[in-house]
Structures are given as C-alpha cells and as structure tokens.
Amino acid sequence: MSKKMVSLFLVLLMVFSATASLAEGSEIVVTDMFGREVTLSEPATRIVVMQPSDCEILCAIGCEEAIVGRGQYVDYPASILEVPVVQSGAETNVEEILALQPQVVLMNSMSQSEEQVKQLEENGVKVVVSTTSNIESVYTAIRLIGKLMGKDAEAEAVITDMQTTFDEIKAKTSGETKKVYFEISPPPYLYTAGSSSYMNELAEICGITNIFGDQEDAWLMISEEQVIERNPDYIVLITNMGSAGVEEILSREGWGDINAIKNQKVFNDDDSCMARPSPRLKDAAIELYNFVYEIEAEEEPAA
C-alpha cells in the first residue's frame, strides 16, 4: 500500500472516529419513573405530552415548541391550546398519536394500557413514564424531562427556584397550629390528600396541619363524618368547580359547625396550580400562604 493510500486511510479513520464519538456523546439515556430505560440518539425535538403537569414542566424548561400533541386535559399555558389534541387514558388512539410523528410520548403510569404502549414502541416511538405524588418526585420528574430534552441546567434552575420559594415561605410562617382540609372531589365520592402527597407538604411549608396527614396514602377516599369530626379551620377545594364549589360546600348539609364553614375560610384552586404536580407548586404554596395568613397578592412572600 502506498504512503498516499495509508495517509488517506488514517484520515478517514480519524473522521469516522470523531463522528462516532460525537454521536455517542449526544445519545440520551434516561430511566423513567416506572424503572424503564429509554435511549434516544439525541435530545427529543418532537413530543406528545399526555398529562398537564408534564406539559407545564416542558414549558418551564423552555421546550414548548417541541410539543406536537397534547392530552385533552392539557390546557396550561394558554398558548398550548393551539397544539393538536389527542385522546388520553383508556380512549387513547395510537394512530392519532402516530400521525403527529413524535419521537417520544410522555405519559402517566395510570393513563395508558400496556397494549397501547407496545403499539407505540413497535412503531418506533419512545414511551417515557412520569408519575408523581410528593414534591421530591416532582423534582425527579423535572430532572427526567430535562435530561430527555437536553435541558439539564434549565431543569435544575426550575427546581432551585421552587426550593427557594418554599424556604422563603417557611421562614415567614408564624407557627400556626390550625388545620386544613383538601377536597379533591365532592360527595358522594370524597377524596383528599394524605401524608405522602405534595398537598400535605404544601400545608407543612405554610405552617399548618393537614387533617388527614395521619394517613399514609397520598390520595384516599373518606367520609363526610370524618371531615366533620376533624373540624378543619381551612378548606381548600381542588374540585375544578369554580365558585359553584365554594357555594356548595358553604351550604353543605351537616357541615355548618365546621370552623372553616362558620368563618367562611374556603379557598378555591381556580387556576389548578394545586391540582398539578408541576413547577407551579411554587405558586400554589404562595396562594396557600396568602390565604392562611390573609395577605394580599401583591405582598407575596416570594417572587
């Protein structure tokens, strides 16, 4: 082999090695919150997001433009309403999702069946599961999605912002000893938050006690009698019923002797920030603090 041929071979080998190293360096490997390892050749640029909280995380780290489809309950921020809707949960239409040509579908562990996941993966779509119940798991979801999108630094900045707000609120609480009840759904199927939920943590951050904080489950079904017996000083509605929900609970039969009802200390989560385990939990903590300590919005304890 001539010297020219050897030199050409070495140059080509170096180019190939550099290209291979570049490709290897851009590969994304994540372990989702269901313990499944997912590998992408590069950060995702086309994604269908099935649940509201994950959409809010994507937008918070600057990836809204990568969202090509959304579940029917995904509605924040308002600009996301222009993105095509796909059915979620048991009604998920795989063909509808595939038509949007996503690289990744981001979903909740309870939302889609194994068969639907299998169909998506057989068609080359990566499925990443995000599932949250407490604040630490929200941080995990933010880091997961940040890595998936090649936005690790942005994800850490969002987490730091949340932590800073929580710490500032904790420093301002006055050792309040009163109790709060979170109503997630109204009668006849009353659901509330237990000790392993982020709502319980929001109460702790604000220096108050969740009346069902002695229950280990994150979410649990309860009876009206239990609420009446535990006599909360504050009630927070996460029922998505607007002002009608407040009016209903204030006039609910048998609840008239509850402190929160007598003093009309009922707060409605009308912007859904308490309902969603997303970066807006920061806003939820501010709203709860302002409600409990009767502070006007412009006097927020954190930016």
Residue ranges and their predicted role:
Residues K4-M5, L10, T19-S53, D152-Y181, ...:
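Bacterial Sec-exported substrate-binding components of ABC uptake systems
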Residues M33-G35, P84-E95, Q215-E224:
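Short helix-initiation/N-cap motifs at beta->coil->alpha
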Residues T45-L100, V104-M110, I208-I211:
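A short, structured surface patch at a secondary-structure boundary
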Residues R46, T92, S137-T140, L144-K147, ...:
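Structured C-terminal subdomain patch of bacterial secreted/periplasmic proteins
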Residues G71, S196-W219, F267-N268:
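His/Asp/Glu-enriched short active-site or ligand-binding loop at hydrolase and phosphoryl-transfer sites
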Residues Y73-S79, S111-L144:
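Flexible loop/hinge segments that line or gate small-molecule binding clefts
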Residues V94-P102, I222-N231:
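Short helices/loops that flank or line small-molecule/ion binding pockets
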Residues E115, S130-L144, T177-Y198:
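Extracytoplasmic ligand-binding site segments that recognize negatively charged/polar headgroups
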